[in-house]
A protein has these predicted regions:
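Hydrophobic alpha-helical and helix-loop surface patches within well-folded domains
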Residues: 1-104
Length: 104
């Protein structure tokens, strides 16, 4: 959960379990990066109304992906930086195909 000036996480998100898989570790890193990016975009700056919520969430996701490709200890766990972007784009395209989506 992010707030202006503070981000809180549960212990299990920050301290990896011994039996934790690399996929779970990656997901934990993704959540941390996403929530930390909200401190700058989404908390310090915010939308006027709920219609524009997609903007702060998409920017937080973009920052998450960019951070994961720029930090050597994280990026080294992936074959190449494009893998992260392609997985991100694939998720966005699949979400856009749903009947519940609408033009922005």
């Amino acid at each position: 959960m992010e707030n202006v000036g503070a981000v809180t996480f549960t212990d299990r998100l920050l301290v990896p379990a011994d039996e934790q898989t690399s996929a779970i570790t990656r997901r934990h890193i993704e959540v941390q990066m996403h929530e930390l990016s909200h401190m700058w975009f989404g908390d310090l700056t915010t939308m006027k109304w709920w219609n524009d919520l997609w903007l702060k969430e998409s920017f937080a996701d973009f920052c998450r992906v960019t951070a994961m490709t720029e930090i050597p200890s994280i990026a080294s766990k992936y074959p190449n930086s494009e893998t992260i972007y392609l997985q991100f784009m694939d998720g966005a395209i699949n979400a856009d195909l749903k009947p519940s989506t609408h033009p922005i």
